[in-house]
C-alpha cells in the first residue's frame, strides 16, 4: 500500500511539474478573413487594440432633405464605453464628431471609407481611416478602425412625422472596435 501511495504521489508531482511548464495558448488576434472585402483593412497594418463598445446611439426625427413632407430618424451620435476583452474600460466613443478616446487622454476622429451589412436589426459594419491623434498615448499612430460584430443600434421603429420633429430616441448597441497601426 505504501508503495502504491508513493508511486501515485510521485506521478502527481511529475504531472504537476509538466503542467506548470505548459503555457496557456496565446490569445487569438482578430482575423478579418470572414469580413466583407469593403471593410477589410489594407495589408501593411496590424491589430494593436481590440475593444468592445457598449452604449447607446441617439437618433433625431428630422425632415428628409430634398423630400418635402417626408421625415426620417437621423443618426445624431454615439455614447459608448470601450472595454478590453477582459471587461476593463480602456476608452470611450462619442460624438459628433465621432471620436475614439483612450483613458490616457489621447483621442482621434476618422473618415468613413466603407460600410457593409451588419445583419437584420444591427447597424452596419464599418471601416474608417483615422485622422492624426490628439495627445500622446494609445491613439497615436492608429491608421484604421473597424466596427464589427454589431448588435442593435438601428433607428427606432416608432414613426417619425411632422408632429415629432426634433424628438430624440436612444437605442442600445454593442460593437467591436478593432484598432490598427502600420506594420
Question: What kind of region is each of these model predictions?
Answer:
Residues 1-8:
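Bacterial N-terminal signal peptides that target proteins for export
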Residues 14-17:
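C-terminal motif of bacterial Sec signal peptides marking the signal peptidase cleavage site
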Residues 19-21:
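Bacterial signal peptide processing site
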Residues 25-56, 65-183:
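Primary mode marks residue(s) on the alpha4-beta5-alpha5 output face of response regulator receiver
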